[in-house]
Amino acid sequence: MHLTPVLWDELPAFQNTPLLKRLFHGGLPQALLSATKTPSFYREWMDSFFARDIQRLFAFRDPDKFNALFEFVMKQSGGLLEITRTASALGISRPTVENHLRALETTHAVTLLRPFHGGGQKEIIKTPKVYAFDTGFVSFCRGWDPLRPDDYGVLWEHLVLEFLRAHGHEWKIQYWRDASGREIDFVIPRNRAEVDIIECKWDPKKLDPAAMKVFRSYYPKGKNYLISPLSIPGYSKRVAGLEIYVSNPDGWGQRLESSRSGKK
C-alpha cells in the first residue's frame, strides 16, 4: 500500500482548500474536506491501521506496542530518530522498534531520511530523520489545535517532502547535518559530482544561509533551492555568495522537468 495525501499541486481540485487547512487537517480527502477537524477520525484511523494493514502484512501480535511507536514517531516527525533512545522511552526492545519501523516504512506511513555525508567534517552519518506521511496526524498527535504560526514551518516541510517524493521519485532524498547543528532540510545527489540542496521556509525572508554556505564549502557543485508557499513566479537571488532559486513546489517541479528534458 502507498498512502498518498493530497499534494500541493492538487489543492485546487479539492475546492481550492486553503493551505493552512491542508496543513492542519492533513491530506486524506475525508479529513481535508471536513468542515471541522474531528480528533476521533485520526484516532480511529491509527487504531484500524494496525488491524487493516500491519497485522495482515507483518503478523505483529501486539497492537499496543505498535501503536505506541507509531504515535511516538508522529510526535518526533520532522526530527532525528535515535533507535536506542526510542526503545528506552517506550520500554520496547530495540529489535522490536526496528521491526516496527520497517513495517511503517514499507507501508509508507513514515519516511526515514538518511544523512548525506562524505566530504565534510563532523557530519552526522547514521541517525535518520523521520517524517510521518500526513500533516494532519502530526498536528493531531502533537496536540496542535489550533495551529500557531510557530507550527507552520515544520508542517510545511512535510508538505514539501511529499511533493518531492511524488515528483522526483527517481532521486534519493536525504538530509545533511553537522555536529554544530547546522542542517539542510533536503539533499538530492544528482550524480557523483553534483548535489542539489533544498531549504523549506514558510517565510522566505527568514532564511539563514549559514548551513548552505558550509555545505557548499564541502560540496560546491549543485543547485540551491528555497521552497516557500509563494503565489508569485520563482526567482533567483544571491545570498551570502550563493545563487538560490526561490519558488513554491511547482517552481521546483518545473525546473526538474527542464533538467530531465535537457533544458537549462
Give the residues covered by each predicted segment.
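Interdomain hinge/linker elements that couple catalytic modules in large macromolecular machines
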Residues: 2-179
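A cross-kingdom feature that marks ATP-driven nucleic-acid transaction machinery
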Residues: 102-103, 109, 114-264
